[in-house]
Amino acid sequence: NYGKEASSRSSDLQNLIDDVNKTQSISILAHPFDQGLSLLREPSIPWTNWEIKNFTGLEIFNLSSEFKTQSHNIFQIVKNALDQKSFPVGPDENSIVKWDELLCKGIAVNAYSASDAHQKVRRIGPFRLITFPYAFHFSALNNHLYVPEKLSGNLLKDKELIYNSLRIGRSFVGFDLVAPTTGFRFFAEGENRKAWPGERMSIRNGVTIKIDIPQESICRLIHNGNVLRQWE
């Protein structure tokens, strides 16, 4: 939602991010620990400049990077390309560790996912082969937003609601390939108000963390890298 040409400014990333923030836009570090896939001549495109500050968030789960990570030989490449449900395992461990590291330093950083879909259609004789179909990628992994009010159909108003929730991190990453995550809720309640992810509130008079999970699952509440409690 930046609305400006940015590639020519890549030599001064901090200046670019500062300008993004001035315009109330969003800066997300994509596939920060991406690995290459030499068999397909796919280069490694990780994020390496961790000196920058004040970016909005980083991707902790990217399906395109996950394909490369889980494809170690030609047989796995073919299998994963033909059966897209076979390769997504979960969020990138290195990205989770980096996110946790930043949070433990008191740096507010949001977590995002990316379908990073690259549907390809190939013809093999009379056959038409579709790999990485959009329908699969856009349903397997999603950023779910907590918007403060129902979308109205007014484009400008709804865009502001959506972008604002993305900007402050009022959202969660849902690995919907495993099970639908719609209906998951995580919020803090206290002082006659609720605070959703990305929001702040005083804990002076006590706060209750509430979690609603749409299906039976294992739930871990983690703080500063430590599991405070686990439910099954």
List each model region and its residues.
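C-terminal functional module detector
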Residues: 105-111, 115-232
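Domain-core and long-helix interface of multi-subunit machines
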Residues: 5-134, 149-150, 215-227
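Conserved beta strand-loop-helix elements of the APE1-like EEP
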Residues: 1-3
